Amino acid sequence: MSIARRTTLSKFLIEQQRETNNLPADLRLLIEVVARACKAISYNVSKGALGEALGTAGSENVQGEVQKKLDILSNEILLDANEWGGNLAAMASEEMETFFPIPANYPRGEYLLVFDPLDGSSNIDVNVSIGTIFSVLRCPDGKQATEESFLQPGTQQVAAGYAVYGPQTVFVLTTGNGVNCFTLDREVGSWVLTQSNMQIPADTREYAINASNARHWYDPVKRYVDELNAGKDGPRGDNFNMRWIASMVADVHRILNRGGIFMYPADKRTPDRPGKLRLMYEANPMSFIVEQAGGAATTGTQRIMEVQPTGLHQRVPVFLGSKNEVERVTGYHDEAK
């Protein structure tokens, strides 16, 4: 691809704005700011030990998880990049207990930004792919946000995306009109369109789940995974391979490219906690992307994007990816009711 013929993220968004007329200018600018922040995060991640940002920060987030130094730095990068642009009413993050209203000395906009600044951060110190996940909603109260303003089902998202910081840095985006992938050209500092209208195959031979938790799974998940593991001699009559990176962005990106099902179910260890992944800034944006790519995403009993949130840090079980596999495991949950 010659440099002259490359489609950058900025050009792509402007063309979308012109052609479909459903991408408001403020939303386009917001996406570009988030993408620039992801470039900055990528730079800090790539420095590794040379940047003195590895290791823990000696603090915990609202989830009770030990924060890595890069968790905090990535959160600050996203806040600093987005607070002054005039496109947002407020932001919310995995790393903050409450939402972050745009300071009064900056102009406010009509959008809400929700993000996991560094997903898979347990992999930071061992140099495994990690990433950033984000979701954009409209503020129902205009430009004056409250916590309740954020509590919208995923069907109300106007944009969602993620960045993966791996061998290449990629930025995957949907605005409700398909899924596209951009790769960071570090030499010129721009995001270049490298995959258009991504589609997840309906059938798959790969699945992603943390099998070390198998003894804690509920029966529908046990049944489904046991069938996969039985291979050609089992009821599925085919061999399946398990893949698990322990980084949602990396696992989902693989599925987006070659099919598969990602599962993070609820289990018996914490019956009062429905799953581990957070609805607002992990499950919803990934579900939006997966559905736009022809896949499916459920909690096992309900379409994820139809779940009505009750809190910023609400957790849900997650089954997403190739449509036929998600429908199968969801059907097993229905049968078990």
From Swiss-Prot:
Q: Note the subunit structure.
A: Homotetramer.
Q: Which reaction does it catalyse?
A: beta-D-fructose 1,6-bisphosphate + H2O = beta-D-fructose 6-phosphate + phosphate
The record's family statement is: Belongs to the FBPase class 1 family.
Q: Where in the cell is it found?
A: Cytoplasm
Q: Which UniProt keywords apply?
A: Carbohydrate metabolism, Cytoplasm, Hydrolase, Magnesium, Metal-binding
EC number, as in UniProt: 3.1.3.11
Q: How is the cofactor bound?
A: Binds 2 magnesium ions per subunit.
Name of the protein in question = Fructose-1,6-bisphosphatase class 1
Gene Ontology CC: one annotated term: cytosol
Q: Which residues bind Mg(2+) 2?
A: 116, 119, 282
Q: Which residues bind Mg(2+) 1?
A: 94, 116, 118
Its EC top class is hydrolase
The protein's matches in InterPro entries, at most eight in alphabetical order, are given as:
FBPase_C_dom, FBPase_class-1, FBPase_N, FBPtase
* Cofactor dependence: Mg(2+)
Pathway involvement?
Carbohydrate biosynthesis; gluconeogenesis
> Which molecular function GO terms apply here?
fructose 1,6-bisphosphate 1-phosphatase activity; magnesium ion binding
* GO biological process, any: fructose 6-phosphate metabolic process
Which residues participate in substrate binding? 119-122, 210, 276
